[in-house]
């Protein structure tokens, strides 16, 4: 009979598909265990049994975790022996009630799918894949907890400038992915805090099985008051005691902290108001609630020793929202910014579409006008160890920056240097300062164009800007008049047969407020991947209404300096579209340009003949498109 030996195990199997198959089987066949937490717990117990089995067997020795050794009837007994050995070795982690509850038929199925796989070779990713496939976005998404994707963990560890003796804490460690990878990369002084008992147990158990000698993952809420901590927590997780914080804190509007006792511990637990004279933000009163990621910024600084560093993942809105400037002021006054890395909006898919940034701080008095590193990652790849080169380029540039005492010879979106005095309106978004766009503007300015600020044209009343309206869902489908939304603007024109249409009565209510005229330019101001799209209103397009995410630009008087066609051309140039892209801020999952269209520099030709030619060509194209559209509509009329 053929038995599996330790040497026969392979890492060539696709763990992702194996777990999907197991999940589907157990969900339909495992009696008495339907909750995802219980399914994951049973799978976790089997995974650690297999890991221990591989660790305990010699290369030429048969493994216990197989169906046929010595025969199928002893399978459950062998698995229980492995589990009891783990139970006895780690009685403070596993509880008395913990046991293998899976029935023999289901156990045989699971073992049949895993027996040839080498868990040791997959130790960096096995837990993450297990949770992704068994619980997916439901893991703790309702509590603001999302898996830290493997590429982002790679980035976090690549940004560490530490030695192996560095004392590291993750105060919201979840299943321990960040700490597990830190441990496997040679950082052995690792500590974790997790308020969810189930997740804390998983992280601790997996770490000790990987070789971590000490129980350093503790159940507890990092944000709770110090006096409410257990003696064990006070002994092991103290303030001013860590060299490095690595954390992906829970975030989201659905999980606010509203406990007054917790809030009053933090400066950021209070409301702040901007002093109109000094421009500084002043603390005024306790907030009713605060997002957890905000409080984690302050708590992590408290955990750090003087000179310690924090690498924290934050939603982009924290670093850009006008109402959150008091947070930026707090950061600037209580720490030194070392680096800010922008991650793509797809980084945490499929769990959340929230755009994030990585902020690296040092707990130290900030120097005067110091410099710091910025980098932009536009794309990453999941479920593969060979990540798209954006991450590698940013890591390499940051390491060069550190070795060169805070300087870079070459600047690119993958690495550039900013000073505190370079900041505008306390905006900490790397895209906003993209050096590629700044260089493009310098090159254009030296050519045959002058750069005119859009906002200056509005102030001079050369351009008038209005916005659309939200008419309410009850108005949809009440008539035949197009209600134009952001998705209805494409290819320089509008879709006059949109999904949403309204009645004559609704149109009459808004027609004078919106005042849509031929020659107006519609501009998408909000909406993921749509911002910057433009359409020129033709005489056939005027009987419409536009939603509030669309702006209407009108050149008040066509002149030799500017007319509607030249403005339309300028807005659609690559340099304008790049500027617009760099000024988009993402609040949670909503992209918006806000009033930053005013900051966009329009390229206006200096040569009258060049300007005239651009106007004529743009006009010709737009009129031809309008004529073709009209002709096609007539063709369809029977």
Predicted regions: what they are:
Residues 359, 543-551, 584-609:
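A short glycine-rich beta-alpha junction/loop motif
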Residues 401-469, 604-638:
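Non-catalytic DNA-recognition/assembly elements of restriction-modification systems
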Residues 2-6, 350-450:
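Flexible, glycine-/basic-rich loop-and-beta segments that form/coincide
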Residues 281-361:
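Conserved Class I SAM-dependent methyltransferase catalytic core
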Residues 248, 445-492, 590:
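Low-complexity, Lys/Gly-biased intrinsically disordered segments
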Residues 485, 512-514, 518-571:
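A short beta-sheet element
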Residues 142-247, 252-263, 314-317, 327-328, ...:
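Conserved S-adenosyl-L-methionine
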Residues 34, 41-137:
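Long recognition/docking surfaces used for binding and targeting
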């Amino acid at each position: 009979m053929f038995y599996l030996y330790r040497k026969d195990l392979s890492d060539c199997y696709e763990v992702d598909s194996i777990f999907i198959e197991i999940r589907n089987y157990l969900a339909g066949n495992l009696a008495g265990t339907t909750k995802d937490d219980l399914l994951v717990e049973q799978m976790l117990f089997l995974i650690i049994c297999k890991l221990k089995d591989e660790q305990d067997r010699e290369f030429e020795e048969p493994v216990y975790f197989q169906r046929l050794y010595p025969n199928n009837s002893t399978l459950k007994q062998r698995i229980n022996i492995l589990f009891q050995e783990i139970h006895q070795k780690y009685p403070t982690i596993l509880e008395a009630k913990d046991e293998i509850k899976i029935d023999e038929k289901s156990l045989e199925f699971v073992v049949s799918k895993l027996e040839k796989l080498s868990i040791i070779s997959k130790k960096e990713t096995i837990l993450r894949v297990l949770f992704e496939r068994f619980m997916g976005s439901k893991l703790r998404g309702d509590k603001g907890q999302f898996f830290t994707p493997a590429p982002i963990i790679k980035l976090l560890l690549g940004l560490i400038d530490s030695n192996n003796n560095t004392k590291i804490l993750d105060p919201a460690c979840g299943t321990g992915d960040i700490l597990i990878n830190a441990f496997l990369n040679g950082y052995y002084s690792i500590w974790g805090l997790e308020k969810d008992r189930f997740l804390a147990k998983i992280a601790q158990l997996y770490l000790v099985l990987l070789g971590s000698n000490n129980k350093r993952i503790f159940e507890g809420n990092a944000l709770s008051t110090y006096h409410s901590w257990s003696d064990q927590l006070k002994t092991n997780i103290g303030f001013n005691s860590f060299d490095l914080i690595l954390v992906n804190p829970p975030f989201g509007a659905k999980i606010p902290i509203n406990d007054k006792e917790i809030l009053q511990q933090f400066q950021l637990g209070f409301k702040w108001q901007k002093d109109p004279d000094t421009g500084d933000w002043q603390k005024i009163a306790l907030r009713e609630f605060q997002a957890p990621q905000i409080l984690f910024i302050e708590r992590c600084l408290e955990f750090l020793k003087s000179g310690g560093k924090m690498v924290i993942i934050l939603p982009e809105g924290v670093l850009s929202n006008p109402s959150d400037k008091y947070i930026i002021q707090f950061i600037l006054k209580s720490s030194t910014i070392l680096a800010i890395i922008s991650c793509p909006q797809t980084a945490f898919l499929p769990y959340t579409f929230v755009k994030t940034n990585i902020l690296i701080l040092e707990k130290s008095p900030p120097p005067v006008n110091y410099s710091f590193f910025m980098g932009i990652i536009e794309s990453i790849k999941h479920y593969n160890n060979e990540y798209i080169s954006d991450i590698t380029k940013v890591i390499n540039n940051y390491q060069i920056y550190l070795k060169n005492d805070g300087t870079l010879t070459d600047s690119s979106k993958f690495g550039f240097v900013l000073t505190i005095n370079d900041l505008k309106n306390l905006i900490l978004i790397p895209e906003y300062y993209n050096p590629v766009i700044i260089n493009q503007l310098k090159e254009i300015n030296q050519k045959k164009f002058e750069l005119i600020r859009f906002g200056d044209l509005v102030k001079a009343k050369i351009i008038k800007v209005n916005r659309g309206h939200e008419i309410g869902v009850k108005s949809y489908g009440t008539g035949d008049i197009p209600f134009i939304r952001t998705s209805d603007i494409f290819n320089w024109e509008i879709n006059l047969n949109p999904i949403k249409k309204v009645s004559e009565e609704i149109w009459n209510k808004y027609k004078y407020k919106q005042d849509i005229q031929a020659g107006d330019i519609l501009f998408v101001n909000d909406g993921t991947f749509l911002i910057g799209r433009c359409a020129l209103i033709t005489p056939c397009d005027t009987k419409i209404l536009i939603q509030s995410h669309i702006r209407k630009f009108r050149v008040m008087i066509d002149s030799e300096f500017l007319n509607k066609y030249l403005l339309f051309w300028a807005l659609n140039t690559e340099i304008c579209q790049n500027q617009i892209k760099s000024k988009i801020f993402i609040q949670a999952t909503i992209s918006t340009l806000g009033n930053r269209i005013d900051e966009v520099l329009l390229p206006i030709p200096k040569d009258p003949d060049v300007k005239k030619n651009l106007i004529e060509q743009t006009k010709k194209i737009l009129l031809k498109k309008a004529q073709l559209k009209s002709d096609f509509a007539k063709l369809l009329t029977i």
